Amino acid sequence: MGRRSKSRALSVWMNGERVGDWRRPAAGGQEFLYAESWLSSPAARPISLSLPLRPSREPYRTGVEAFFDNLLPDNRQIRERIQRRFRTASIGAFDLLQEIGRDCVGALQLLPEDHSPVNVKQITGERLTTDGVAELLTRSLGSTFAREESLEDTFRISLAGAQEKTALLFREGVWHRPTHTTPTTHILKLPLGTNPQGIDLSTSVENEWLCSQIVRAYGIEVAQCWMEAFGEHKTLIVERFDRRLASDGTWYLRLPQEDLCQATSTSPGLKYESDGGPGIGDIMELLLGSEQAAKDRRDFMRTQFVCWMLAAIDGHAKNFSVFLLPRGAYKLTPRYDILSAYPVLGHGRGKLSPEKIKMAMAVHGKNRHYRWKEICARHWLETAKRCGFGEMKTIIQDVIARTPAVIQQVRAVVPAGFPAQIADSILGGISTRAEQITVELSG
């Protein structure tokens, strides 16, 4: 059972500076107001492209809930587990984030209105053994506390997405549970298991690791990651690109960023283009305003094409992000959360039909095309043309030319004991796609 919400306002902080206040007025709704001190700070920047700095300090009332909602898992079951664990009034963004908003994606910390972060420029944490990490992962899957664990001692972090995960501090080769305001530096992702449709995704750790190697080999910047086991828990460890050690080595900075649902004021429930979320054209238009627009637009289209080659069909707007720079500037972050459908393609129980699977964002011909198997090179060229982007054919030719070397390079780093079905299906899949595109382009 939930409890009544304790607060009608949370203070929003970034690296020890107060950014503003997130409020629930008595009349209803939500609002966000930038702090006057933040507007005059050398570090000032908006918390979102959808909530620009306002010198007038007029509060925002639209788009506020969508922004903060996107800081949380969009999986209802995970939200309900957080609700039970922290005994919150609801699974709404405000109620959950007042409990777990101390270490969010990006740079934000959410604290009670009358609190401020302490010891920001220090690194503190509780050292963890391998068994300690395993115990923490086990506990993260539960909905209740260990008897000796109090609410005050509980590790409170918020990670968006639909997957079971937690985050820790990794420093000088040792794992720590950060304390006070020290941020986490690495995300630990557990296997997805079997989804509600009966699709076995228990090898998602190996799948995502392999996809990251492939994407990097194609020349795309992607989050660094590795695989590691903690007791019974197979884990993908992802280095956070929204964290950076300060130049003096004494503390970690939180780097401001947001996903493209936040940037476009899109609710996480509408993250897919077919549901009303941003599509390729919307994002290419947004990237025209990037600090490095030409590079970001080129990298985004290259990523889209490579993900299609990979049958990585879940590339919705939450799986792309931008760094937020001073005074409203921004640029694309590295890629992340890329998972191939090749290992589960087929017909029958527990399989995804290749004829039915859809990409998260459509490409264009005479009509919109979502179905993965129907998409051809000409659709990519037409989509790029509509976006005012003239480099798509060069990108396609380069990706196809690189594919044999990419396969060879990635096979060379696949570790012993890696599931052969995962490696063979994904690497074989991109090889087949490359051959098909070669035939189409030469026809």
Task: Report each predicted region and the residues it spans.
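Phosphate/dinucleotide-binding and metal-coordinating scaffold of catalytic cores
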Residues: 1-317, 321-443
